[in-house]
Regions:
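Short, well-ordered beta-strand elements within core beta-sheets of diverse protein domains
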Residues: 37-44, 59-65, 151, 260-263, ...
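Hydrophobic face of amphipathic alpha-helices that form TPR/SEL1-like repeat modules
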Residues: 1-33, 357
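A short acidic/small-residue loop/turn micro-motif
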Residues: 20-21, 26-27, 43-47, 266
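Rossmann-like NAD(P) dinucleotide-binding subdomain of oxidoreductase/dehydrogenase enzymes
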Residues: 127-270, 308, 399
Length: 494
C-alpha cells in the first residue's frame, strides 16, 4: 500500500478552529520504522489548555441540551466518516505507531467506527425511571452530563483508544479536551480534520505536546469535572491524585502482566495461535498482553519446541507492507528498555529460547524492530514475570495443577486481562472466575469488541470502558421529588 499523505504541520484544534500554539512552538513526530520525520505538531502551553477548556464549557451550554436522536446522528455520521477513510487512517496509524497495516485495517480503524455506532444505539435505548413513593409522592430519576472532561490517550492504540473515550463522551452530552500522546498524535489530528464539520465547535478539542508539561496542565486544570486516562500505572497514580485533590472522578485503564494459561487438553492449533496473538499483537505493546505464559507440565516440552518454531517464522517488517506480521516498537527508548529486560531475565536464570535481539538487517536497519522473544526456565517471582515489559517478550512458566496456576496467576500487582485454554468448560469457568482480573478470555485472546466491559482491578485501573456502563461515569444521577398532595403539611402554624 502507498503511504498516507500528511500535512507538513498540524495545529491545535480548539473551539472548532485550527490554531497555532500560543508560544508558536512545535515538535516533530517520527516514524519508528525508518526514523523519518512525518510532521510537525503544535506544542501546547498552559494558555492553550485554558482556551480549550473555556471553549468546551461554552459549547456545553448548548450540547448538553441536544436530544438523544441528535447525538446519535452525530455518532453514526462519525462512524460513516471513519469507514469512508479507513485506508487513509489505517496507514497514518501504521506510519506513526509502527504497527502492521494488516492490524490497523482489521482492528484499530473498523473497531473504532463500531464503537461510535454502539454508543449511538445505547443512548437511544436508555430510559430514566419514575417511582411512586406513596399516594402523594413521585420520584423521578434522571441522568445528566457531568460537564467538561479531560481525556489523555496512550501511544499504543492512539486511534482506537480515542474512540473508546470520545464516543461515550459525545453520547452522554459532555464536552472534552483531548490530549494525544506526544509520540503518536497524527491519527487523532487527521480524525479531527475529517469530523470538524460534524461535531459542533468546542465539543471536541485536541491538545498536543511533546513533553509532560501539556499533560500536567490538564491534570492541574480546575475546569474539568472528570478525568479519563489510559497508560502506565505510574502516571495513572498521578492522574488519580489530581482527580482526588479536585474531588472529581477518574477512569483509569493502566498496566498489566496478564496470565495466558494453557492446560494439557487445549486445542493445539488454537493454543499456538493464542500464544502469538497474546504477546505479538501490536509488537506486545498491549496493556493486557499475555506476557506470563503458564503451561501445564505434561505438555511443556512440546509446547516450547513448537512455540519457538512459530516465533522464528514470524515476518518482522516495515509496517506499511501487507505481508508484515510484526512491525516496529514505538521508539528506540522502548526498544532498549525491552532488551534490558531480556538481560535482566538472563541474570535471574531465565533462558532465551528465541529472539531477544534487535532486527536490523536490510530495510529494518533504521527502525526499532525486535525479534519475537520467548524466555524459558522462568519462575513467577522473577522481575521479568512481575514487571510490565511492554514488548514481544513472553515468559513461559511451568505448572502442575489448577490450584497451583491460579495461585501464581494471582501473585501479581496487576489484574487487567488473561486467558485459559482448555476443552473442559467447567475448568474454563473455574479458572476464569478464579483469576483476579477484569477480563478473562476462554480459548481466545485480545478480542476487544464493543459491548463488552473492559478494565482492570488492583494496579491495572479503575472503571470499565467499551460498554454502556461507561455512560454512568460521564453522567450524574439527579432525583426530582414531586409532592402531589394538595394541602399543607400542617407541620407549622397556618
Amino acid at each position: 500500500m502507498e503511504k498516507a499523505k500528511l500535512q507538513e504541520r498540524y495545529q491545535l484544534f480548539i473551539g472548532g478552529q485550527w490554531k497555532d500554539a500560543s508560544a508558536h512552538e512545535t515538535f516533530k513526530t517520527i516514524c519508528p520504522a525508518d526514523g523519518s520525520v512525518l510532521a510537525e505538531c503544535a506544542q501546547a502551553t498552559k494558555e492553550d489548555v485554558d482556551e480549550a477548556v473555556k471553549a468546551a464549557w461554552e459549547a456545553f451550554k448548548t450540547w448538553k441540551h441536544t436530544t438523544v436522536a441528535e447525538r446519535a446522528a452525530v455518532l453514526n455520521k462519525i462512524a460513516a466518516i471513519i469507514d469512508e477513510n479507513k485506508e487513509h487512517l489505517a496507514m497514518v496509524e501504521s506510519m506513526d505507531n509502527g504497527k502492521p497495516i494488516r492490524e490497523t485495517l482489521a482492528v484499530d480503524i473498523p473497531m473504532a467506527a463500531d464503537h461510535f455506532r454502539y454508543f449511538a444505539g445505547c443512548i437511544q435505548a436508555e430510559e430514566g425511571s419514575a417511582n411512586i413513593l406513596g399516594k402523594d409522592t413521585l420520584s423521578l430519576i434522571l441522568r445528566e452530563p457531568i460537564g467538561v472532561v479531560g481525556q489523555i490517550v496512550p501511544w499504543n492504540f492512539p486511534f482506537l483508544m480515542a474512540a473508546w473515550k470520545l464516543a461515550p463522551v459525545l453520547a452522554s452530552g459532555c464536552c472534552t479536551v483531548f490530549k494525544t500522546s506526544s509520540t503518536t498524535p497524527l491519527s487523532v489530528l487527521e480524525f479531527a480534520r475529517l469530523v470538524q464539520d460534524v461535531i459542533p465547535a468546542g465539543v471536541f478539542n485536541v491538545i498536543t505536546g511533546s513533553d509532560s508539561k501539556s499533560g500536567q496542565y490538564m491534570l492541574d486544570h480546575p475546569g474539568f469535572r472528570k478525568l479519563a486516562f489510559t497508560g502506565s500505572t505510574e502516571v495513572g497514580r498521578n492522574v488519580a491524585l489530581a482527580a482526588a485533590q479536585k474531588l472529581i472522578p477518574a477512569t483509569l485503564e493502566l498496566g498489566g502482566k496478564s496470565a495466558n494459561i494453557f492446560f494439557e487438553d487445549c486445542d493445539w492449533e488454537m493454543a499456538m495461535d493464542g500464544l502469538q496473538m497474546g504477546i505479538l499483537f501490536n509488537q506486545g505493546q498491549v496493556c493486557c498482553a499475555g506476557s506470563r505464559v503458564f503451561v501445564q507440565e505434561s505438555i511443556y516440552d512440546r509446547f516450547v519446541e513448537e512455540a519457538v518454531k512459530r516465533f522464528n517464522k514470524v515476518k518482522v517488517g516495515l509496517p506499511w507492507k501487507e505481508e508484515t506480521q510484526m512491525g516496529s516498537q514505538i521508539d528506540r527508548r522502548q526498544m532498549e528498555k525491552i532488551l534490558k529486560y531480556v538481560e535482566i531475565g538472563k541474570e535471574e536464570g531465565a533462558k532465551v529460547l528465541c529472539g531477544g535481539v534487535q532486527a536490523k538487517e536490510g530495510e529494518l536497519e533504521k527502525g526499532c524492530f525486535l525479534r519475537p522473544t520467548l524466555l524459558g526456565d522462568v519462575t513467577n517471582d522473577m522481575r521479568v514475570a512481575q514487571e510490565e515489559i511492554f514488548g514481544p517478550v513472553a515468559c513461559i512458566i511451568k505448572f502442575k495443577t489448577e490450584e497451583e496456576v491460579l495461585a501464581m496467576a494471582n501473585d501479581s500487582a496487576y489484574g487487567l486481562g488473561g486467558a485459559v485454554w482448555t476443552r473442559d468448560i467447567n475448568r474454563a469457568l473455574r479458572v476464569a472466575r478464579g483469576v483476579e482480573t477484569g477480563r478473562m478470555w476462554v480459548n481466545t485472546y485480545n478480542a476487544i469488541p464493543e459491548g463488552t466491559p473492559f478494565g482492570g482491578c488492583k494496579a491495572s485501573g479503575i472503571g470499565r470502558e467499551t460498554h454502556k456502563v461507561i455512560l454512568e461515569h460521564y453522567t450524574q444521577m439527579k432525583n426530582i421529588m414531586i409532592n402531589m398532595a394538595e394541602a399543607p403539611t400542617g407541620f407549622y402554624p397556618a
